[in-house]
Every structure is written in C-alpha cells, then in structure tokens.
A protein has these predicted regions:
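Beta-sandwich interaction modules
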Residues: 80-114, 121, 130-133
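Hydrophobic beta-strand segments within beta-rich accessory/binding domains
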Residues: 24-45, 49-53, 105, 111-120, ...
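Extended low-complexity, serine/threonine- and proline-enriched intrinsically disordered segments
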Residues: 47-81, 130-135
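Hydrolase catalytic cores
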Residues: 38-39, 47-50, 54-56, 206-273
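C-terminal edge strands of extracellular/lumenal beta-sandwich accessory domains
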Residues: 122-167
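Short, small-residue-biased leader/transition segments that mark boundaries at the very start
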Residues: 3-5
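Subtilisin-like serine protease catalytic core
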Residues: 34-37, 44-47, 158-161, 172-174, ...
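Catalytic-core environment of secreted peptidases
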Residues: 57-65, 167-229, 287
Length: 291
C-alpha cells in the first residue's frame, strides 16, 4: 500500500450532497473577485434531472441535459457558463455535469448567491453530489450554504489499495475539523460500492507539528500533509520489524494497512469505529505489533 494525504477540505464548504426528493434547491455563495469557478455535479446515470441555474440578480436559465455534442454555452447576467455533459466511462458508472463559469464582461464573475434548482424527471436513487475546486482554487467567501463535510477526501486518497491518512489534534485528542471526511463500510456513494471500504484508514497528529524550515530552524505547521509523513515513517518501522528483523517477511502492502487498523486507538468524542472522520482511530505502532 502507498500512503496518501486525505486533504484538508472537511471545513472548506466545497461539497454538497443531497437527494433530489428533499434537497432540490442548493445555494452557492460566490465571493468578490472570482475570475472563474467550476462546479461538478455527479449523479446516477439512471436518474434524469431538470436543472435550473439562477444568477444573483434573478436571471435564470434551464440547462439542457440532452444535447448533441455534449457541450454548449449560455450567459447569465455578466457571466458566461460553459456546460459539459459527461457520460459513464469504462472505469466509472456515474455521470458528471461540469459547469465552467467565466466573465462575459469585465474581469470577474457575478458575486452573490447563485441558486441551483434540481427537479426530478426520472428518479432511481435521487442522489447527487456537487463539488467546487479544492484548496486555494477559490476565495474564502465562496462556498455552499449547508455544505456537506462527508466525502471530501481527494484523489489519490480515494483509491482502494492505499493507506489514507487524516489528521487529529494531538493536544486535545480530537478529530481536526479541516481533515477531509470519507465513508465507512455502511455507506454508499455514487459510483462507489463502499461496502468493505473505509476512508480514511486512520489519523495521525496534524495540528501545530514542529517541522524544519528553510532557515535551519523549526516552525509549527498544520494539515494532513504533515500527518501523512508520520504514518509513512511508522510504516517503515513496521516493515523493518517484519522484513529486516525477520519477524514477518510478508509485512508489506495491504498487510501494513491491516496492522495499522488493528493497532489504532480511540479518540475523544468518537463513539463508533470505523467512521468517516477518523477511520479506525489514531496511529499507534506499539499496538500494531504482534506480541
């Protein structure tokens, strides 16, 4: 198994998950000075939605989801919207509808509240997921109202045969809210049969970690990017114990993940394991070793 950062999107307001039978209206705040913004809508290919988009000034348009060529352009107020209609792929059963918003006039797209209305035409599951660009791709004021923190882990941490690492606050022994959330065994997401698949696998310290800087000193850093190297080092120690010292010559790959899961310890405030926040718990190499 390879080690993967889970990303720090848990509190970023960049994801909304809903069911069209009860969450057909989604509001998106667009901050000032956004030069462009893209929105991904993922849904079950069997579902057919009628989609309407309303600009901050009240002008609205219906998005055609059945058009030859799979792409077209429309304008709302001072914003040009490029619409791309995706299809299922050899490696994915879900459908993506991709909206790329750019200025039609001036340098910025319209700031304010954009509203996406989804109306069912043919409903099989009714599930849908909306995503904005991750990290620094958008301003701090841009995000969904009533955002969904679940399923905010990012590629490549979504792959099955990697060890996905989140972050926790080692001072308070609690989950770090910026750490992206995944899914547990009992959940299912569009295009992902998550039975038996848990993300993240575990968490490691990721708040105010002392790391070397370019000046030859140390500085406090925060993020899943600093939790993952801790688990990488722990994996190296585990494989040294198993392979180099002769305790287990086959201690690599998914077996390392299994040992980490077995040794993970509980965190304050988490009552059920595994879960979509901390997986099996916090890293503990000592508990992962066989007696």
């Amino acid at each position: 198994s390879e080690m993967c950062i889970r990303d720090s999107e848990g509190a970023a307001r960049g994801h909304f998950a809903g069911n069209i039978t009860r969450d057909g209206r989604v509001e998106l705040a667009v901050g000032n000075y956004e030069r462009n913004l893209n929105i991904q809508l993922w849904k079950n290919y069997s579902d057919v939605f009628r989609i309407r988009l309303q600009a901050p000034g009240g002008e609205e348009a219906e998005l055609s989801t059945n058009i030859q060529g799979g792409k077209y352009t429309l304008e709302l107020e001072q914003t040009r919207i490029l619409v791309y209609l995706g299809e299922p792929l050899p490696y994915a059963v879900a459908q993506e509808i991709y909206l790329d918003m750019i200025p039609a006039e001036g340098s910025y797209i319209n700031a304010g509240i954009w509203t996406i209305r989804l109306e069912p035409v043919v409903t099989v599951t009714g599930q849908y997921y909306l995503y904005l660009p991750a990290g620094s791709g958008i301003g701090e004021s841009t995000g969904f109202y009533r955002a969904t923190p679940q399923v905010t882990l990012t590629i490549p941490s979504t792959a099955a045969k990697v060890i996905t690492v989140g972050a926790y606050d080692q001072v308070y022994d609690t989950y770090a809210d910026f750490s992206g959330r995944g899914y547990a065994d009992s959940t299912r997401t569009i295009g992902v049969a998550a039975a038996g698949l848990t993300k993240p696998d575990l968490v490691a310290p990721g708040v105010n970690i002392q790391a070397p800087d370019v000046y030859g000193s140390f500085t406090p850093v925060t993020g899943t990017s600093f939790a993952t190297p801790i688990v990488s080092g722990a994996a190296a120690l585990l494989m040294e114990w198993g392979i180099v010292r002769g305790n287990d010559p086959f201690l690599y790959g998914e077996k390392v993940k299994a040992y980490f899961r077995k040794g993970a310890r509980p965190l304050r405030g988490e009552t059920e394991y595994p879960n979509d926040r901390v997986g099996y718990g916090k890293l503990c190499v000592a508990e992962s070793l066989l007696e």
